[in-house]
Amino acid sequence: MRITWFGHSAFRLDFGESHVLIDPFFTGNPAFEGGDAARARAVEGATHILITHGHGDHVGDTLAVAAETGAKVVTNYDLCMWLGSKGLTNFDPMNTGGTTDQGGFKVTLVRADHSAGMSEAGVTVPLGLPNGVVVRAPGEPTVYHMGDTDIFGDMALIQEIYRPDVLIVPIGDRFTMGAETAALAVRKFFAPRAVIPCHYGSFPIIAASADAFVAALDGSGVQVVVPHKGTAVTIA
């Protein structure tokens, strides 16, 4: 599997015939580099878009990318219905605890401790529960993108049920858990092959780097991968 980080919480997973974008926040993302050409490369051939929750920095370019590529959008029911009201037609609604078979892989929505909603005409529209997403494909590492969340004890159940090989962990503080708490979550609940930090280095009011997270996991035996933005890393 090739995993590409585009800054903030935006990722792409490439495996087999599947090309999966998660939280495709390009336009307006201060951490996204390379402009229109990089965006075109990031979305080229996308087959699916997974959205962890209904905030603008995670919904991002979903409508535009879906229109450009024909990618199927997979997210919670409420957010699917809202996107449908904006013209999206190719979507697969689900909810927390549910699993859907996308052909070459399965998606499960799991718990996240956060909020979700978008502002329209000065009114916040609730958009269902926030989630993490677990992606499982035959012969590929299982990936758990936590979305935006704090630590919670039932992460132990996520480990027991899904045994993720790759964790994508928010570390930026303020809107999610910070570096030390995120490191505690990794050490206490999981046994991954690799951990990738996210949700930092974008907006000035969250953490600027992953240094504190890396330091907090030093000596733990956990492999922390801090990718260069736009450059794929391969995890077998």
Swiss-Prot record:
Keyword presence, Hydrolase: yes
Pfam families: Lactamase_B_3
Disulfide cysteine pairs (residue numbers): none
Hydrolase is among the record's keywords: yes
InterPro entries in alphabetical order: Metallo-B-lactamas, RibonucZ/Hydroxyglut_hydro, UPF0173, UPF0173_UPF0282_UlaG_hydrolase
Domain of life of the native organism: Bacteria
GO MF: hydrolase activity
Keywords, ordered alphabetically: Hydrolase
Similarity section: Belongs to the UPF0173 family.
Protein name, as recorded: UPF0173 metal-dependent hydrolase M446_4343
Lineage: Bacteria, Pseudomonadati, Pseudomonadota, Alphaproteobacteria, Hyphomicrobiales
